[in-house]
């Protein structure tokens, strides 16, 4: 039961830290959406024109078919419009967000701050163990170590950070418990997509 309690604490730490990483992202969200909206305008215009044609054609067919009790074509038009919206969302919004996130996480100081925050968080929860900190594979370990300083480095296995298999962000592993606190770029992108997706849809597709 003690291990279960510790695992619950670990989950709470991960959730709390991930929420903290969303705060600066919220400040960036408006700029991301504005940029995405500019990039998406041409695609959206074409998509809406195409969707309108599909729906108009479907409705014409449906007027006839409905007399026979069939409405499948009208529904197909609506599904086509939704598919086009999703294509724009994935192409423009996700790519813009991923680019911003990659740029932010490429900064060695950001990686150092994330590592320090994770270590401080587990210490505050009374969790201890042999720690390994992994950073993105394109971030310089020496620079991150310099930002961390001797006090924090002394708490890490090998007295420094290691290179992970992910692009950006960090992971902290409690070796003896085989726990991993994951703030890697893929994890953060997934969280940000879910956090900002509704606002993006409302702004881009308003009235469509």
Swiss-Prot record:
Keyword ATP-binding included in the entry's annotation: no
Recorded superkingdom: Bacteria
Entry GO terms, CC: proton-transporting two-sector ATPase complex, catalytic domain
Molecular-function GO terms, alphabetical: ATP binding; proton-transporting ATP synthase activity, rotational mechanism; proton-transporting ATPase activity, rotational mechanism
GO BP annotations, alphabetical order: proton motive force-driven plasma membrane ATP synthesis
Transmembrane segments: none
Family: Belongs to the V-ATPase E subunit family.
Entry-linked HAMAP family: ATP_synth_E_arch
Protein's job: Produces ATP from ADP in the presence of a proton gradient across the membrane.
Protein name as catalogued: V-type ATP synthase subunit E
Organism: Chlamydia felis (strain Fe/C-56) (Chlamydophila felis)
Gene, per the UniProt record: atpE
